[in-house]
Structure formats: C-alpha cells, structure tokens
Design a protein with these regions (language model features):
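Conserved beta-propeller blade repeats
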Residues: 31-36, 70-84, 115-129, 133, ...
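Beta-strand C-termini and the immediately following turn/loop, strongest in propeller blades
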Residues: 42-49, 77-94, 131-140, 179-187, ...
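A short loop-to-beta-strand structural motif that recurs across blades of beta-propeller domains
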Residues: 54, 100-102, 145-147, 192-194, ...
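Acidic, serine/threonine- and glycine-rich low-complexity intrinsically disordered segments
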Residues: 158-275, 279, 287
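An edge-strand/N-cap motif at the start of beta-rich repeat modules
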Residues: 29-65
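Post-signal peptide N-terminal segment of secreted/secretory-pathway proteins
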Residues: 54-138
C-alpha cells in the first residue's frame, strides 16, 4: 500500500489500495421477522428533519416521504430485485465516522461491520453485488482496500489480483464485471483501468495508455468517460472500447464530483478550470459535445449534494438559491426534453440526491 499526491482544487490525494479481502466471517445475518422497505422511486433524497433524517421519493417533480431514519448517510438500491444497502453511522470519529453496512435483500437483513468505517458503495446493475472500500481504524491511513460482497449468497468475493486500486475509482461495468483504476506493482509502474470478472475470477487490462493520472471515470455501455491530469493540464476524454480509441472532449474541466446517465446522454457536476466555477454539464451521447447547463440558476451548485437521473431524462441535483444560507440547499431538475432547469423543493434544507442510476 502506498500513496501518491496530486492537486485537486487544493490537493488531490490518491491512495492506492490493495484489492484484498479478509478471509474471516464478515457479516451477521438477522433471521427475525421479514424486513419491509417502502419502495423507492428512481430518484430519492435524504432530508434533514428535527431529530431525524427522512428519505423522500422524487417523481415527476413531486417530493413525498418514504421512510424515516436517525443514522443513515448513504443508500444504494435496486427495486426490481429487492436489494437495499444502507450505511448507518454508529458514532462520530476524529477523521472518519464509525459505521456499518445494512443490507436488506428479499426481506432479509445482513450486517457488515468488520471494519471501522466503510464508504463509496457501488451496487451492481442487477443489485446482487456491492463494491466498497473500508478503513480499519479512525484514520485515513488505515485504508483496507476495495471489497466485494455477494448479496445473493451472503458472502465476500475474494479477488486474485496484485493491482493497487486508487481510492474510490471503481465502478461496476455489468452484473459480473467491475472496472477499477490502479497499478499492478508486480509488473509495471503505469496505472491503467482494469476489468475483473468475478464469475470467472479473471482480470485483464480494460483501458491502457491513459494520458496522465486518471481522477474520475464513468462506464457508458462498454465505453468509458474519463478525466485525467498530466502536470497542469486536464483532459476529459471518451474511450471507445470497440476500436480501442480515445476522443478528446475538453481541457476546461479540472474536476468531476459525481456523474449520472440518461438513456441518451451523460451528465456530471464538475469544476471549470478557467472560471474556477462549478457547473452541471452534459455530454451528448452521439456527438460527445460538452455543454454547460447551469450559469446563474442556481447561483451555486452543491458539489456534495448528489446527482441522479430517471427514465424520463430528468436530472436531479442540489444547489444554493441563497448563498447566505449555506449549507441549506434546494433541489433542482434539468429536463432533457425541454432543455430547462427548474427548482422543485418548496424550502431550503440539507438535501442529498441519490438514485438507482
């Protein structure tokens, strides 16, 4: 395990984490009554309430309460296959919060807690597997690496790999294959995006010859949108797997916070290097043209407020209507069909957008 620093607004820090899984039993299964979870819509939001947090469904511009919680900070889910994954805070720490992962699959509860803290959960396309990273202690230096858990069979999946994964740079490509960016220290010193098939226990290079250091990537079908940095230059590019080629999209974006996809296009919250300002961006799925979608409305993007999309091509995100009232934000929606941005929340709160996409 080692770390490599580089600039990210102030400073990026890449921590290369070994893909290694703990061999001992790592979960507890509750065999009690069936756990009922209200069905979530494609897009949901966490909302701060007086003594708790509410999870609210968002659909067609309407916001309605689905359930209440006191300690939940993240949700990943797949309605079709009845898979719901929550991160629950146990207690606050100095550098990290002590937490646990609660899994509800087909009404049965499983707890993962063989770590101090877990984060960056990514759920597979059908909702049967999750990838996440964990920390052994209340310290960012105690990173244990990326882990994969099989929700259906209630067991960790051991990966045979010498690749050191960079932070949270891992994403499911499909139900059985996951992509991750890192270095195989046993063979070379150049980082690449690798693919691992958990069914066949097979690893292979997926994206090679990346220009500089990759700081973000998002699969789009078999292709990959990625942001890289080389010195003081940034490169937003699109990798076409079929012909093994890169197309440069822009050099103006120096950071991507989070992204999502509609059936047509790709979207992300990112920082413009020239203006030092955050925007909601769209990349056209056909032409790969980059477009800013927000200027003065909202006045400021909430880069930590999340982003998600639904089947209608509505892109939900958070922003600040009144800059004096930060950290209270509002919920906005970009409607792909109308090419418009609207505010849909009725008052400011601490919203955090999440969704199936």
């Amino acid at each position: 395990m080692f770390k490599k620093g580089f600039k990210n607004i102030g400073y990026f820090i890449i921590v290369f984490l070994v893909i290694g899984l703990v061999g001992c039993k790592s979960h507890r299964i509750s065999e009690g009554e069936k756990v009922d979870i209200p069905k979530f819509t494609e897009v949901i939001t966490l909302k701060r309430e007086k003594d708790s947090l509410g999870i609210y469904n968002i659909e067609n511009g309407d916001i309605s309460k689905a359930m209440e919680t006191k300690d939940m900070v993240d949700v990943k889910y797949n309605n079709k296959n009845s898979a719901y994954v929550f991160i629950n805070i146990i207690e606050k720490g100095k550098e990290l919060n002590k937490n646990k992962i609660t899994i509800i699959k087909n009404g049965k509860r499983t707890i993962l807690d063989n770590f101090y803290s877990a984060s960056d959960i990514d759920i597979s396309k059908e909702g049967n597997k999750i990838a996440y990273r964990s920390f052994k202690q209340d310290s960012l230096q105690s990173a244990e690496g990326m882990k994969i858990y099989d929700l259906e069979n209630k067991k960790e999946i051991k990966i045979k790999s010498d690749v050191l994964v960079s932070g949270s740079l891992f994403k499911w490509l499909n139900e059985d294959e996951i992509l991750y960016y890192g270095i195989n220290s046993e063979k070379e010193n150049k980082a690449k995006i690798y693919k691992y098939n958990v069914k066949e226990n097979k690893e292979e290079v997926y994206v090679d010859n990346i220009e500089g250091i990759c700081t973000y990537f998002m699969p789009n079908g078999d292709n990959v949108l990625l942001l890289s940095r080389q010195g003081d230059k940034f490169n937003l590019s699109y990798y076409n797997k079929k012909d093994n080629s890169f197309k440069k999209i822009s050099e103006e974006v120096n950071q991507i916070y989070k992204g999502t996809k509609s059936t047509k296009n790709m979207y992300f919250l990112g920082k413009n290097d020239l203006e030092n300002k955050d925007y909601l961006y769209k990349i056209d799925g056909n032409t790969l043209n980059l477009t800013k979608l927000t200027y003065d409305f909202p006045p400021k993007i909430d880069i930590n407020g999340g982003i998600a999309s639904d089947k209608n091509g509505s892109i939900y995100f958070s922003g600040y209507e009144d800059l004096k009232e930060q950290p209270l934000n509002e919920i906005y929606v970009y409607k792909e069909k109308d090419d418009t941005v609207e505010i849909i929340s009725d008052k400011e709160n601490s919203y955090h957008i999440m969704g199936e996409r």
